[in-house]
């Protein structure tokens, strides 16, 4: 599996983009099955990866955090059934408090350092080209910005960059183990996640002057007319970084060809979510509704059992289906609590695996799609209450839950998927403000509930007012929440009958 972070579907040639240079993604679409209705589940980074391990949504119960003691982990299940699993990654959130036990589920793992302010090198003097916070890059916390530029000073050549090192480690694993049977390799790079640090040779593919603005790291905020030039700059940088990702995708495909792996080796190419680059007058994610640019994702699967090439599937699939597909490939029974479904039959004949699917962020809109419509249910009150975290692992992205948060903890009855374990119930009003959104108040309430017809309005510019469709989508939402054993107060927060 080759996994990218924040890879935009609408920026790829197989999904209709005619200006981003990414020939290997087109080559991949000709080799594999391309999914046209692939959606996220839980977001952003670590919640998406928890979905990838467990095959079930987690955003209704807690925010960003580690795997829980009761979670089923796909890589660990493979490992325990005699299938060695290996992770190579530069996704530095794995080495932080809020992601600290994902990589340990694999049989073995290797890392490369230096992405997005990763606290890697400890240089006490500023790099020569450091853009001090009185320049174009004022939006970043000074310590994160400085650390990122310190890291860059140690990447003088492309081969020193995290994506290059990560893919090289993955190719090394293939070289050593390609003759063996039954193994799982996850090559996971943080690119094309921001900041958009990219070698010049990929920028040279575009007719654009990248030197005119010294800023490659978008803020998470609403934008105005004065931001249009910077928006174009970010979009071009993102395109150049996608071209870099495309190059390394090509290396993986080339090596599979050289080693004869296409005959018996599944390849999955996926992402966790997308990223807004000015659409809907926003940059980034998490601070706004989860529009298609974020929630509707690229997904490609080559299954050597059926050898389906160049086909497009229109069935609704999600991140939670990937672990189910992998377990099925190795003839391993799916855990009882896994909600994702294997996609083998979908690849062959577009067999549906669900009527509708949930997606969202803890404490924000709860969204449901049937592949035709997207319904975004907003909080029913400006306080966005009641809202709780349910966990045995009280950690945010970069730090533990605060003492004040933990002082609100009580023990709640087990959920259907916690294997008889009661869990801590912690008031989310003291949230850590670390992109998990827990504890935020009126922001999502002010956006209101939204309904879109994404077949006729894929850019979601024209919200629908259709009582009949909304009623059907509410029923999909309610049933999916019940199936996920959502906490009762989530229904109350959204103004829904349970």
Listing of model-derived features with the role each one plays in the protein:
Residues 1-33, 42, 79, 447, ...:
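Active-site-proximal N-terminal segment of extracellular/periplasmic enzymes that hydrolyze or transfer
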Residues 1, 99-110, 116, 143-148, ...:
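Active-site regions of oxyanion-processing enzymes, predominantly non-cytosolic
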Residues 49-156, 360-361:
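Catalytic-site neighborhoods of secreted/periplasmic enzymes
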Residues 22, 52, 159, 163, ...:
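Polar, surface-exposed loop/tail segments
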Residues 292, 362-465:
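C-terminal, low-complexity/hydrophilic appendages and adjacent surface loops
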Residues 160-178, 219-265, 329:
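A long, amphipathic alpha-helix that forms part
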Residues 20, 195-208, 255-318, 354:
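Histidine-centered active-site microenvironments of extracellular/periplasmic hydrolases
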Residues 18-21, 40, 65-72, 232-244, ...:
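A short beta-strand-to-alpha-helix junction
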């Amino acid at each position: 599996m080759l996994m990218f972070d924040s890879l935009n579907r609408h920026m790829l040639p197989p999904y209709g983009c005619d200006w981003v240079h990414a020939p290997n993604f087109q080559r991949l679409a000709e080799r594999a099955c391309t999914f046209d209705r692939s959606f996220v589940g839980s977001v952003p980074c670590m919640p998406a990866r928890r979905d990838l391990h467990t095959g079930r949504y987690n955003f209704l119960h807690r925010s960003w955090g580690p795997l829980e003691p009761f979670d089923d982990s796909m890589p660990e299940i493979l490992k325990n059934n005699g299938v060695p699993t290996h992770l190579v990654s530069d996704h530095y959130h794995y080495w932080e408090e809020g992601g600290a036990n994902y990589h340990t589920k694999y049989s073995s793992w290797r890392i490369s350092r230096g992405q997005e302010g990763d606290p890697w090198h400890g240089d006490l003097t500023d790099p020569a080209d450091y853009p001090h916070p009185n320049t174009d890059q004022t939006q970043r916390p000074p310590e994160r910005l400085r650390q990122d530029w310190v890291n860059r000073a140690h990447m003088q050549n492309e081969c020193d960059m995290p994506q290059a090192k990560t893919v090289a480690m993955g190719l090394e694993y293939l070289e050593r183990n390609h003759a063996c049977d039954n193994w799982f390799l996850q090559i996971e790079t943080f690119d094309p996640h921001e900041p958009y640090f990219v070698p010049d040779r990929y920028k040279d593919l575009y007719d654009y002057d990248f030197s005119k603005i010294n800023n490659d790291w978008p803020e998470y905020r609403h934008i105005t007319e004065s931001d249009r030039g910077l928006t174009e700059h970010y979009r071009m940088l993102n395109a150049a970084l996608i071209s870099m990702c495309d190059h390394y995708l090509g290396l993986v495909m080339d090596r599979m060809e050289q080693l004869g792996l296409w005959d018996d080796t599944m390849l999955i190419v996926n992402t966790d979510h997308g990223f807004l680059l000015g659409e809907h007058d926003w940059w980034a994610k998490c601070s706004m509704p989860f529009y298609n640019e974020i929630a509707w994702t690229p997904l490609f699967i080559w299954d050597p059992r059926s050898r389906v090439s160049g086909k497009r599937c229109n069935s609704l699939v999600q991140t939670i289906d990937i672990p189910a597909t992998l377990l099925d490939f190795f003839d391993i029974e799916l855990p009882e609590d896994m909600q994702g479904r294997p996609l083998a039959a979908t690849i062959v004949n577009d067999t549906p695996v669900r009527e509708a699917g949930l997606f969202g962020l803890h404490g924000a809109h709860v969204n449901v799609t049937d592949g035709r419509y997207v319904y975004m249910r907003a909080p029913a009150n400006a306080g966005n209450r009641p809202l709780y975290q349910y966990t045995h692992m009280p950690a945010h992205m970069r730090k533990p839950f605060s003492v004040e948060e933990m002082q609100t903890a009580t023990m709640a009855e087990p959920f259907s998927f916690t294997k008889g374990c009661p869990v801590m119930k912690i008031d989310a009003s003291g949230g850590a403000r670390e992109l998990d959104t827990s504890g935020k108040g009126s922001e999502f309430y002010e956006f209101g509930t939204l309904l879109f017809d994404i077949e006729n309005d894929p850019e979601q510019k024209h919200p629908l007012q259709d009582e009949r469709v909304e009623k059907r989508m509410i029923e999909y939402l309610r049933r999916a929440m019940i199936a996920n054993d959502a906490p009762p107060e989530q229904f109350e927060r959204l103004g829904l009958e349970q």
